[in-house]
């Protein structure tokens, strides 16, 4: 079964010939898991964008061993792809703050005339996972505040329309940043992508900031989603077929692609429904104070 790597190898059309889509977004949302600190400058340096295909030191990009072979295959496929030949990056930010329970990482991609701001999901640190659990009773968490700050700063330096997105917690950050960015930015944002990203507390969906940007959200989850069904979700969800099982479906490398799009399912798997119902019952029966304990 084909994957995002196959798509990067086989889809040769430019985004002008074949518009940017959910699969493209997931690819960029996967690349943000790489360590760009040795190649891409932070926002404060105001340096030029760097072409992705100029990077040849793969070991420096890979700071952890998870999915190492697949990550290298994706890097090579994107670098060799006519569709992504003009992919550039800038404004890399990577923050780990144990004291304030903050894990945040973002980068800005430019593909031809398109600007895509990608937020990283939870990494394998205790700080990252602790912040995820804090979302059950607290909003905003530090990473959400950083996402708004980052979007506001980057948009000040760049003109034109914006796309924002991320995988896992990165999808949640993309939505939250779009909700609370400057009002003019809300109209500049063309699309918001959440790939198996957790939802929000119920009251968020009733707020005006959410309602303003709700129609721009594209949320995708795998059939046995767990992370993407955490907390409440109001968006219309597109369910993607996966070639793995259980929690391993969360990995973007396992999502099935065919004919330049995801392969979609009509409903989530039984195990996903059970987990979703259990979490919903817990949220309905507890208060923020009790969840914090």
What do the PLM-derived regions correspond to, one by one?
Residues 165-170, 174:
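Gly/Ala-rich beta-loop-alpha elbow adjacent to hydrolase catalytic centers
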């Amino acid at each position: 079964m084909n994957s995002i790597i196959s798509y990067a190898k086989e889809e040769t059309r430019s985004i002008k010939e074949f518009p940017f889509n959910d699969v493209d977004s997931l690819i960029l949302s996967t690349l943000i898991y790489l360590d760009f600190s040795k190649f891409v400058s932070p926002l404060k340096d105001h340096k030029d964008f760097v072409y992705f295909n100029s990077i040849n030191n793969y070991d420096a990009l890979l700071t952890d061993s998870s999915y190492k072979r697949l990550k290298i295959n994706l890097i090579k496929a994107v670098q060799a792809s006519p569709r992504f030949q003009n992919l550039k990056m800038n404004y890399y930010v990577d923050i780990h703050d144990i004291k304030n329970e903050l894990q945040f990482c973002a980068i800005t991609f430019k593909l031809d005339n398109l600007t895509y701001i990608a937020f990283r999901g939870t990494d394998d640190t205790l700080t990252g996972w602790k912040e995820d659990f804090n979302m059950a009773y607290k909003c905003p968490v530090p990473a959400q505040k950083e996402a708004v700050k980052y979007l506001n700063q980057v948009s000040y330096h760049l003109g034109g329309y914006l796309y924002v997105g991320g995988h896992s917690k990165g999808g949640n950050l993309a939505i939250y940043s779009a909700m609370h960015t400057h009002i003019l930015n809300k109209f500049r944002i063309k699309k918001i992508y959440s790939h198996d990203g957790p939802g929000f507390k119920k009251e968020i969906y009733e707020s005006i900031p959410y309602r303003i940007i709700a129609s721009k959200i594209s949320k995708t989850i795998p059939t046995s989603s767990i992370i993407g069904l955490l907390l409440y979700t109001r968006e219309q969800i597109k369910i993607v077929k996966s070639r793995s099982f259980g929690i391993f479906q969360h990995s973007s490398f396992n999502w099935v692609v065919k004919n330049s799009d995801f392969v979609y399912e009509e409903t989530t798997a039984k195990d996903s429904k059970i987990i979703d119902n259990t979490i919903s019952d817990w949220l309905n029966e507890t208060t923020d104070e009790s969840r914090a304990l």
